[in-house]
Amino acid sequence: MKKIAILGSTGSIGTQTLEVVRENGDIEVLGLAAGSNISLLEEQIREFQPKLVAVWDEKKAAELKIKVQDLDVKIVTGMDGLIEVSVMEEVEILLTAVVGMIGIRPTVEAIKAGKDIALANKETLVTAGHIIMPLAKEMGVSILPVDSEHSAIFQSLQGNKMNSIHKILLTASGGPFRGKKQEDLLNIQVEDALKHPNWAMGRKITIDSSTMVNKGLEVIEATWLFGVEVDKVQVVVQPQSVIHSMVEYEDGAIIAQLGTPDMKLPIQYALYYPKRRYLPGDRLDFWRMGKLDFEKPDMDTFYGLALAYEAGRTGGSLPTVFNAANEMAVGQFLNREIKYLEIIEIIEDCMRAHKNIENPTLDQILETEAETYARIKSRR
């Protein structure tokens, strides 16, 4: 029986991971970690019986201890708690699905402890790929992508040598505002931006998809996962979200992974790699589908994608600024403190003001994040 721990168990990826566990019946969940949703976390604890649970919020952790005092489970808190879950001795795979740079330290410690990583926390590689990937190689652990696009690329690379890649074709749905111009986005409200046409996701990533910043983060993530230069990653808008990504090889052949927009497929693939398992759910019906569309992304309207390429080309600490500025700006937009188009304005302002650090340490990455947050707060 495979033994796993999940960081971010109450979020979109975490809950779908537990659905995969439930459907298969041969995975033991030893550890869970969540932010503050202790009502759902209690349900998960009672069903999956983990030995160790981390809650980021200390007050909520105290409440949870009372709720589950009839169970044999240890409750821990904060960053130390996340790390304790991540390095549990019996755990074979750590699935990290927390949102933001909070996932970096637990991922580093899990790799040092020899755990394979099922990675749904793209910010870890965006900001610290130069630390994570060499460490994973040194420790002999696998980084298994859970993002649908990176899983598709990973699957399309099976049986082929990495040095034969001509380019990666990273697909995007285009989000809810595909085809719009900047002037059409002046009065976008939170509710408008949360209406993704194809995927059911968390609030932050749904906003990121609407601005195409999410795709920019995925471009940078792909460079670290697959060892390619940023300009070898080409974004292609594929509105139906049927082709999840493609790899073009030196001989001109293109291999793609297709499927319905269901995150359980890449989650299950990562948990059972290299084996495949039956997965219940809808299947593609090519007779009914009719056609697939492809478009070039509009980087003038969705300027955040252009900024991501700039951050990826520059490297160093600039991707951290890009990511941190976006995190805070999206939070402000969701709280109705700023307008939609200000998200990208804030990202660009922070990038232009930053003095780049070429090869930042983990501490410097976290300092850069804090400095970026402070700059945005000072705008008010």
Identify the role of each PLM range:
Residues 1-380:
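Catalytic, metal-anchored helix/loop core of enzyme active sites in primary metabolism
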